[in-house]
Amino acid sequence: MTLLSKRSLYLAAATAVLAVGALVFFKSGTEIAPESKFVLLDGSSKTTAELKGRVTLVNFWATSCVTCVAEMPKIIATYNKYHPQGFDTIAVAMSYDPPAYVVNYAQTRQLPFNVAIDNTGAVARAWGEVKLTPTTYVVNKRGEIVKRFVGEPDFAELHKLIESLLKQV
C-alpha cells in the first residue's frame, strides 16, 4: 500500500467515525415511554398505551416527600390549566408510601387527576429505576418521553414545553 492510499484509508475511517458520532450526538434524544400498568386509587388501571394522543405528566411522588407535597398545588394548577386542551397527569405514589396515606392525601387535597399506587415498585423500575422523589416525566402525544425533571420542575419552563407539545399533531 502506498503512503497516499494509507492516508486515504485513514481519512475515510475518520470520516465514518465522525459521521456516526454526529448521528448519535444529534439524535432527537426521545425515548418511548415504557410499557406500564398504573393501578389507580379506585381499583381501575391505565396503561402507557392509553396515554397516546395526549400530552401527559407522569409524576413519581410520596406523601413523606416535602418537595412533592410543596409542588402538588402547582401540579394541580398545571393540570387544571391544560387538561381541557388535551393534557393529562398521573401521580404515581412510590412503593414505600402507605396506601392509606396516599388515599387520604388525594381525597383531602381533592387531586383532580389520576393517582396510582406502585405497590410493587414495578412502575418505578420500568421508568428508569426511579428512586428520588419527585421525579417527573413529560410524555408527548406519540408516547415519547421528551423531558425528565428530578426535583421540582421549573414550572414556567414546564408550561412552555406543555404548550409547545399541545400544538403538535
Where are these regions (language model features)?
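Hydrophobic beta-strand core positions in alpha/beta domains
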Residues: 57-59, 91-93, 137-138
